[in-house]
Amino acid sequence: MKAMERWFNVGKIVNTHGIRGEVRVISRTDFPEERYKKGNKLYIFRERDTEPIEVTVKSHRVHKSFDLLSFEGYDSINDVERFKGAMLKVPESQLGELAEGEYYFHEIIGCTVVTEGGETIGAVKEILTPGANDVWVVRREDGSEALIPYIDEVVLHVDPERKTIIIRPMEGLLE
């Protein structure tokens, strides 16, 4: 592992689940079914450790609003208890390529949103995933928030390198 590797959060272990080594995870990944696939490598970062702990996903299932994961070689609650509160991360090299028009959350958060007329709306601070399409929460300069749906009719251009997004606001969107 390269010392200068960039790491990306994919989840937070908030508790154990049952007695067979499952952990309850609040997912922070755009692609949980891909990221938590059996056989995938994840890295556990605990505050007091200097090096991450590499684990291999043994199983993944969704229960209520949590992702439940188990790892190879960690078969009881006693094995995973110490992971409570830890972050699950992957190195940048593990992110993989996306199709055109798809972006990782970290590429969108922090982008400046501008209308096609050149008016600056604000910066994306959060991404909501309520259903059919993502919704970007944009912090305006006056501190208020605008909700921008990630749909073709509204989002005209995304430039992650320049950290800019150009939109065509629908009537009433920015009021």
From Swiss-Prot:
Domain spans labelled PRC barrel: 100-173
Pfam families for this protein: PRC, RimM
This protein's UniProt keywords: Chaperone, Cytoplasm, Ribosome biogenesis, rRNA processing
Protein name: Ribosome maturation factor RimM
Subcellular location: Cytoplasm
Biological process, per Gene Ontology: ribosomal small subunit biogenesis; rRNA processing
GO MF term set: ribosome binding
Family: Belongs to the RimM family.
One of the record's GO cellular component terms: ribosome
Keyword Magnesium appears in the UniProt entry: no
Organism: Geobacillus kaustophilus (strain HTA426)
